[in-house]
From Swiss-Prot:
Domain Peptidase S1: 158-388
Glycan-modified residues: 274
Gene (name only): Tmprss11a
Disulfide topology: 183-199, 308-324, 335-364
One term under GO cellular component: extracellular region
Membrane topology: Single-pass type II membrane protein
UniProt-listed Gene3D superfamilies: SEA domain, Trypsin-like serine proteases
Protein known as: Transmembrane protease serine 11A
């Protein structure tokens, strides 16, 4: 392993050492909001208990910084070599907080044992220029706000395909017929879910459908009755175009840490290829398998349309309003039972947006056959026209 460090003098360490540990003294002026700024932004009053609260906030800031550095290097040119980071110290200063961080990397194949400081500084500076940290007290997040999680994302601690933590993806919904999971869906309002139209190809009778919330199907956190199903007017199976539907349910849900709506992007929003995105669902773990009782999560990447439309991938099957995400080598992918579920992305203010709806693909995790998703921005006006959202 290789460790990149800052803030200490390690010039006397010998090159043959397998692990080089040093402290990263990085002024996280933008990445870490100083305690004074935090109090102002979230209107926290400093009182006689401020010492204890400050201690708790420093602990949360430590975790926040680790998460943010994870995200930075996972999305960087060093992602294949990055292992982890750890905050070894936080020092509050006048307007910000200084973080001492140890970062661990795999050594390069060339045999060089170290990576230049300028490389890491350049990546950190570029990636954090517009970033901001999570609030130290997550209970301060307004539950009415869209796209907010009650717990922070720990990016490199997600083992793709593993069960999701409680409250991690509060907009995930299970669409069920006769109490049996059929498809996923995404909560976009207190009475609306968006999903895939093909989920209702054989049965679109609202009375035979219910919605389940929470990270387990059985027992569910709560259930709701479906009142109306709106399939896109131009959806004509077996064609895969316009694979989107809206579900209206009752009674309305009250937003909480475990049930929250996702944000919808503006129609003009764009998301570049290779962006890190996340899929969740109760679907099978392999082709031909059964749906799972526990919600599972996976981290994938957006694949450009130029690549997805290549002959050996999907060719001219990719139409307007579709895009691909996953990995060409296979690995993690949506599968049977994940249809209609969310593909989400996080912005630099830790707000989550729904950018895709699980639509179709050849088998599950097959080489050169990534998942294909309905493009939410393409149908943003349609969603607004039906729901007012």
């Amino acid at each position: 392993m290789e460790v990149a460090g800052y803030g200490t003098h390690n010039r006397d360490l010998k090159q043959w050492m397998v692990t080089l540990l040093s402290a990263l003294s990085l002024m996280m002026v933008v990445v870490t909001i100083g305690l004074l700024a935090l109090f102002l932004v979230f209107d926290i009053q400093v009182n006689s208990n401020s010492g204890q609260k400050s201690s708790n906030q420093l602990k949360d800031l430590q975790e926040t910084n680790e998460n943010l550095v994870d995200e930075i290097f996972i999305d960087s040119a060093l992602n294949n070599r990055y292992i982890k980071n750890h905050v070894v110290g936080l020092t509050p200063e006048e307007d910000d907080t200084k973080a001492d961080i140890v970062m661990v990397f795999q050594p390069p194949a060339t045999g060089r044992r170290t990576v230049g400081k300028k490389t890491h500084h350049s990546i950190l500076d570029q990636k954090t220029r517009n970033a901001r940290a999570l609030p130290a007290d997550v209970s301060l997040v307004q539950v009415k706000d869209c796209g907010k999680r009650a717990i922070p994302l720990i990016a490199n601690r997600i083992v793709s395909g593993n069960p999701a933590a409680k409250g991690a993806w509060p907009w995930q919904v299970s669409l069920q017929r006769s109490n049996i999971h059929q498809c996923g869906g995404t909560l976009i309002g207190n009475m609306w879910v968006v999903t895939a139209a093909h989920c209702f190809r054989t049965n679109s009778n609202p009375r035979q459908w219910t919605l389940s919330f929470g990270t387990t199907i059985n027992p569910p956190l709560m259930k709701r009755d479906v009142r109306r199903i709106i399939m896109h007017e131009r959806y004509r199976p077996p064609a895969r175009d316009h694979d989107i539907a809206l579900v209206q349910f009752s009674p309305r849900v009250t937003f909480s840490d475990e049930v929250r709506r996702i944000c919808l992007p503006e129609p003009s929003a764009s998301f570049p290829p290779n962006s890190t995105v996340y899929i969740t669902g109760f679907g099978a773990l392999y082709y031909g398998g059964e749906s799972q009782n526990e919600l599972r999560e996976a981290r994938v990447q957006i694949i450009s349309n130029d690549i997805c439309k290549k002959r050996h991938v999907y060719g001219n099957e990719i139409k307007r309003g579709m895009f691909c995400a996953g990995f060409l080598e296979g690995n993690y992918d949506a599968c049977r039972g994940d249809s209609g579920g969310p593909l989400v992305i996080r912005d630099n203010k830790d707000t989550w947006y729904l950018i895709g709806i699980v639509s179709w693909g050849d088998n599950c995790g097959q080489k050169n056959k990534p998942g294909v998703y309905t493009q939410v921005t393409y149908y943003r006006h349609w969603i607004a026209s039906k729901t007012g959202l």
